Amino acid sequence: MAYSKKVMDHYENPRNVGSFSSTDLNVGSGLVGAPACGDVMKLQIKVNEKGIIEDACFKTYGCGSAIASSSLVTEWVKGKSIEEAESIKNTTIVEELDLPPVKIHCSILAEDAIKAAISDYKRKKIN
């Protein structure tokens, strides 16, 4: 199976690798995994007082498609509102990265991770 140039670019030069303090009230963290393949994805967002995602980072243990999906999503959410980030769908990730059918689960993980990070952020703001 050959990866697309975009997958290879994000895999070889991942953007936004790292982590924020999970105790920061402006940080939302999402941790998701796929037991079938062993991929684990942690994605975090940092939201400003206007509800705009000003930064994002990730740490992913998995294949090139999982790393590329994480990297791409952290780029996409920067500068977006929470609502805009929530609307990101795995199908858009698949199209952008030209993922083969056997790697679609990686895009689902990325969508689930951003939604989990947003849920965590919202939970912190309510409490």
UniProtKB/Swiss-Prot annotation:
Transmembrane segments: none annotated. CDD domains: IscU_like. InterPro entries: ISCU, NIF_FeS_clus_asmbl_NifU_N. One of its GO terms (cellular component) is cytoplasm. Pfam families: NifU_N (PF01592). GO terms for biological process: iron-sulfur cluster assembly. It comes from the Bacteria. GO terms for molecular function: iron ion binding; iron-sulfur cluster binding. SUPFAM superfamilies: SufE/NifU. Belongs to the NifU family. A scaffold on which IscS assembles Fe-S clusters. Subsequently gives the nascent cluster to other proteins. It is likely that Fe-S cluster coordination is flexible as the role of this complex is to build and then hand off Fe-S clusters. Forms a heterotetramer with IscS; each subunit of the IscS dimer contacts an IscU monomer. This is Iron-sulfur cluster assembly scaffold protein IscU. The lineage of its organism: Bacteria, Pseudomonadati, Pseudomonadota, Gammaproteobacteria, Enterobacterales.
